[in-house]
Amino acid sequence: MAKRISMRFKHGKHVPGIIPIFVHDNLQYPSMKTITFIKQAGIILTACLGFQTVPAQNYEISNIVQSRAGDLKMMRPVGFKQFIEDFGAEGEVINVYPDVEYQEMLGFGGAITETSAYNFMKLSESRRNELAKAYFDATEGLGLNFCRVSIGSNDFALDDSPYVSNNDPKLTTFSIDRDRRYVIPMIKAAQRYCGELYLMATPWSPPAFMKDNGKTINGGKLLPEHRNTWADYIVRFLQEYKKEGINFFCMTVQNEPKASQKWQSCLYSGKEEGEYAVDFLKPHLDKAGFDTLKLIVWDHNKERVLERASESFAVPKARKAIWGVAFHWYSGKHFDQLRMTHERFPEKHLILSEFCKGPATGGTHVPYGDWSDAEDYCAEMIGDFNNYACASIDWNMIVDTKGGPCLYRDDIGGGKASVVADAENNSFELQSTYYAVGHFSKYVKRGARRIGNSTYDDNLLTSSFKNPDGSIAVIVLNKGNNNLRPLLRMNGKIMRLNLPRHSITTVSIKSKGAK
């Protein structure tokens, strides 16, 4: 219902030329208000304000951590002074608006590939516990809580064998024994340290006998006569994992459905993805009791997110059956693709489901541990979150010192990961990207809302979040060559930040008096 109010200046004078205005609830975005201005000339103007009319809270800085190029210690606590009254400073200011709320955050994590799990299990038990804690413990580690698991093999696996013997359409030989060796033990290790681990399931290819090219690799398409077989196969995967005490939060229809890769791959058009989700996957999942599993399309590069989402959601009943859209970072920034997709399909969830640096060796790629990788990760996450992504999932969580093991990649080599394990020496090293992710995951909790912020310099990238407990995390990337000392301004208060050149800073803010 609209409320009639008056607009006045600070000293009580009415705004010239404007008579009573009306404030309406914005039905699409509950945290926004629509204001109607009625001018004396009879012209009606409207504006959307993305804030709630709530009293301003008093906040205080609780912690600041920083990582920077050339520093041996990452996420180092740094000194700070508390907020003071805003004295009207202009220019070098970072603004944060706690009452301007956007999407809810679901989590951060990485892919528990067979490669990652194999490298994990090759370490001693004590080292495995140490590594699991470093990744998944919210107090002593990064607090990761959203991981991706392959349905079968992919290019970062030990072999290309499916869960069934060849030419078994009845799935009588179905077995996940290969996953019981490495993948499932790593998932269970993660679960021990993570409060609630969300898992995304993703297929790279159906078994060869289900495809028109007779191979798991080099693209090919799912044969029409095996559409039900493939859906049954996916259901069996979920059922077998459930027997192990592992449940999935969501799944994508297909990894990179536009790419005919030299490794495991399968091609779908946007329309075909939508049709398969609606006509086959969703009915099979519902019948088997997996009706709450969330279906996601695309799971490929950002430059085509809008078109592919539009094609899939044009399929009748697809907007009801499909929960979200996943994307990768390999084709450039394209952050506006996410914004436009959100604007067209505001109820859909956008997830950064894969990103990594690599190959690990050779060519023009930087070596392990290079700071530029951390900056690239941080810039990607800020850009995606500021355009409505609600989660980020890194690619391999662990590789060996050669970037593997891997399949079908002899010409380009392995990849990088945020942890490099050396089984021979029973050790592992945390890479710069580990800390880049940690600047978000350790301080932005599941259920947080992205909140409004703005900055003054193209070399300063920022993203801000309000946690369910009311605390706030502000992440700032200074990717420039100059040290900067901007003011952080929020709720009528300011404080000075010291941002070294090429650094990532997380500012933690709490309500005054909160523990």
PLM feature spans:
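Bacterial Sec-dependent N-terminal signal peptides
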Residues: 1-58
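N-terminal catalytic cores of secreted or lumenal carbohydrate-active enzymes
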Residues: 75-248, 269, 279
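Substrate-binding and catalytic surfaces of secreted/luminal carbohydrate-active proteins
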Residues: 59-70, 88-92, 200-201, 232-239, ...
